[in-house]
Amino acid sequence: MLRLTQHASLGDRRIVGDMSIRLFYDQWAQYNLRMVEVIGAMSDEHLTVRPAAGRWPIWATVGHTAGARVYWLCAVLGEPGVEDTPFTDPSGAGWEDDLNTPRGADQLVAALQTTWGVVDGCLDRWTPEMLTDTFTREYGDVRRIHTRGSVLQRLFSHDAYHCGELSQTLGVLGLPQIDLWRSD
């Protein structure tokens, strides 16, 4: 049961009770869908285009975007669902780490959809109170503390960042860009 309360000393309104965080990320599913639509329609030739020398081809950027979701949510935070994705290596090695094995549109779409399933589950299960839970990430000799909230913000902005990067490359090629805000 939700109830809206007035906080006496601050004068702000707060929602109290159990609720998921989905409401706060309600457009993220649409962003994923827009990426799936554009990538799914691309040819293998277009997926191998690099925006510049030394940069990843489109397919690797998309694979990296999808793989980051599983790395952070499953490997770092321990969320379920990794087994339903193509990224089952807990070390964090992703498709972008093997540029000699290009991925096609079908593989990329499946990666985006299955990793979205992991994100989607978190949006349903997590409550606002859970966003402050902390987790330790050890990477080599480096040890970092992250909160659920910081990881979710990282992934949301990571998706948007790479959608923008991909859209610039697609625009230069004269291909349809990823329109995150199209409302149809």
Language-model segments: residues:
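Acidic/histidine-rich alpha-helical segments that form the ligand environment
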Residues: G94-T136, S150-H158
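Short, contiguous alpha-helical
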Residues: T5, G11, Y25-I39, E45-G94, ...
